[in-house]
Curated annotation (Swiss-Prot):
One of its GO terms (cellular component) is cytosol. It catalyses: guanosine(37) in tRNA + S-adenosyl-L-methionine = N(1)-methylguanosine(37) in tRNA + S-adenosyl-L-homocysteine + H(+). The keyword Methyltransferase applies. This is tRNA (guanine-N(1)-)-methyltransferase. The keyword Chaperone does not apply. Keywords: Cytoplasm, Methyltransferase, S-adenosyl-L-methionine, Transferase, tRNA processing. Specifically methylates guanosine-37 in various tRNAs. Its main location: cytoplasm. GO terms for biological process: tRNA N1-guanine methylation.
Length: 355
């Protein structure tokens, strides 16, 4: 694979690309990476590459130097990527996809960004490594290069390690242990010492599910939706769930029951609550049992709701935000949206037809 990095600071990449696994991959000819200075394509005697944006502060990279830099290295098979917090999230799946390309061009932004016209003309896609802003796009480019390189045959000493690493199956990896068996009173789990490979595999899967559910509920919900036909190990019954004469009831701890009643009544277009119970309309009768516990004793839950059509999906999200709930995160297909209510409960709202 060949990679060209376009940046105002090409020397920034020298040390990372000479070190460790990436350095070895370049030395062995598995990767060919060049960093180029956008200033080489600057305008006029002083090689100008930036200017003040209209109706805003700071400095912006100009369209012409950026476009000329891209066209200088671009080939028919090239894929041009702009590193930006506005892009699609970088995932293991996206890294696999990029690893199949023969030539990648990474465009690194600086200052307040890049003139939008350059992006519209020459960029194929934008990729984000997270919901935050960096001092320069070079850091993000290195992250993407490192992530995709793991899927290029020969880069890792053992390619199986790339397949087994955390997130490769949609879940966080479980804990790892080495000698000694006991350290400061903490023992290695007994199942790992017995040599029963099937039992170890079951244990690893369960621990991986538990860890993902607790630490990354967004990944856990996506995993469940992506594997609807797959048997997912059943968790122990949640004491917060109970049955009310054939109805499905979910008990939610809330700080202020009147506030929560108003919120859920309006967001679900439900009838007036009966006591502390709120009936959610739909094909399957569900009851929210609101339990006022105050702020200190409140436990938060993760819930899932699937809507039938796209209009209902977006209308529901609109009501949620308008009534004071927060919209947290969407998956890269837009089919699952994570939202939080006033009490911190996380809901995964989904619709198969949403785009």
């Amino acid at each position: 694979m060949e990679i060209d990095i376009l940046s105002l600071f090409p020397d920034y990449f020298d040390s990372p690309l000479r070190s460790s696994i990436l350095g070895r991959a370049i030395k062995n000819g598995l990767l060919k990476i060049q960093s180029r200075d956008i200033r080489e394509f600057g305008l006029g005697k002083w090689k100008q590459v930036d200017d003040a944006p209209f109706n805003n502060d700071g400095m912006l990279l100009m369209a012409e130097p950026v476009v000329q830099a891209i066209r200088y290295v671009k080939r028919r098979e090239s894929r041009v990527i702009h590193l930006s917090p506005q892009g699609v999230p970088l995932t293991a799946q996206k890294s696999r996809e990029l690893a199949k390309c023969s030539h990648l061009i990474f465009l690194c932004g600086h200052y307040e960004g890049i003139d939008e016209r350059a992006l519209e003309i020459e960029v194929d896609e934008e990729i984000s490594i997270g919901d935050y802003v960096l001092t320069n796009g070079g850091i993000a480019a290195l992250v993407v290069i490192d992530a995709l390189s793991r899927f290029i045959p020969g880069v890792l000493g053992n390619q199986e390690s790339a397949e087994k690493d955390s997130l490769e199956n949609g879940l966080l990896e479980g804990p790892q242990y080495t000698r000694p068996r006991v350290f400061e009173g903490r023992e290695v789990p007994q199942v790992l010492l017995q040599g029963d490979h099937q039992a170890i595999a079951r244990w690893r899967k369960q621990v991986s599910l538990d860890r993902t559910r607790e630490r990354r509920p967004d990944l856990y919900v996506r995993y469940l939706y992506d594997r609807e036909s797959e048997d997912v190990p059943q968790m122990e019954a949640d004491p917060k769930q109970s049955a009310f004469e054939g109805e499905c009831a979910v008990v939610l701890d809330v700080e202020n029951i009147n506030r929560s009643k108003r919120f859920y009544s309006k967001v679900f277009k439900s009838n007036q609550p009966i006591g502390d119970k709120l009936y959610i309309p739909g094909k399957t009768q569900m009851v929210l049992h609101l339990q006022e516990v105050g702020l200190k004793n409140k436990n938060t839950a993760v819930l899932s709701l699937r809507l039938d059509c796209e209009n209902d999906f977006y209308s529901f999200l609109g009501r949620w935000k308008m009534l004071g709930g927060t919209l947290e995160q969407a998956d890269d297909r837009g089919a699952v949206r994570l939202v939080r209510d006033f009490d911190g409960h996380l809901w995964a709202i989904s619709c198969k037809k949403a785009k």
